[in-house]
Amino acid sequence: MKHVDIFTDGACSGNPGPGGWGAVLRYGEVEKELCGGEAETTNNRMELMAAISALQALKSPCEVDLYTDSAYVKDGISKWIFGWKKNGWKTSDKKPVKNAELWQALEEARNRHKVTLHWVKGHAGHPENERADELARRGMEPFKKGKAVSF
């Protein structure tokens, strides 16, 4: 099974507001950068989209070390999701889980691989996390007010 390192980040200008996500995938010496964004979103949704998009980009099952600066993503997929599923996608106080469709997509993407999640401190000089942050900002740029969007 191939081993891939993935570094993800999300960004939002306003919360909610325009946002972007970025990911760096590394397999040996080969690297791939991904980014995207939305006009109206939240930082948590962008953090989730970064992880989902990166895992979905892998063409075959891989052993993955996924690095995120989002405790929300790390704790959600490794701790909270089990209770949410058991409770019919409701929180412990019976409210609908925010971003449930993204959590479900992340779980589906994760289940195709052997994923180990790692939390890294954001904006602390971690080179790959800084690159993922730059990509997230690049993904957000077309959606900021006054910017033209080209396709």
UniProtKB/Swiss-Prot annotation:
One Gene Ontology term of the molecular function aspect: magnesium ion binding
Required co-factors: Mg(2+)
GO term, biological process aspect, one: DNA replication, removal of RNA primer
Sequence similarity: Belongs to the RNase H family.
Top-level taxon in the UniProt lineage: Bacteria
EC class (word): hydrolase
PANTHER family, per the entry: RIBONUCLEASE H1 (PTHR10642:SF26)
Swiss-Prot/TrEMBL catalytic activity: Endonucleolytic cleavage to 5'-phosphomonoester
Self-association and partners: Monomer.
Organism: Rhizobium etli (strain ATCC 51251 / DSM 11541 / JCM 21823 / NBRC 15573 / CFN 42)
Cofactor stoichiometry and binding remark: Binds 1 Mg(2+) ion per subunit. May bind a second metal ion at a regulatory site, or after substrate binding.
PROSITE patterns given in the database record: RNASE_H_1
Keyword presence, Hydrolase: yes
Pfam families to which the protein is assigned, alphabetical: RNase_H (PF00075)
SUPFAM superfamilies noted in UniProt: Ribonuclease H-like
EC id: 3.1.26.4
Keyword field: Cytoplasm, Endonuclease, Hydrolase, Magnesium, Metal-binding, Nuclease
UniProt protein name: Ribonuclease H
Residues that, per the record, bind Mg(2+) 2: 9, 133
Intracellular or extracellular location(s): Cytoplasm
Domain RNase H type-1 intervals: 1-141
Record-listed Mg(2+) 1 binding positions: 9, 47, 69
Keyword Hydrolase among UniProt keywords: yes
InterPro entries (alphabetical): RNase_H (IPR050092), RNaseH-like_sf (IPR012337), RNaseH_domain (IPR002156), RNaseH_sf (IPR036397), RNaseHI (IPR022892)
GO cellular component: cytoplasm
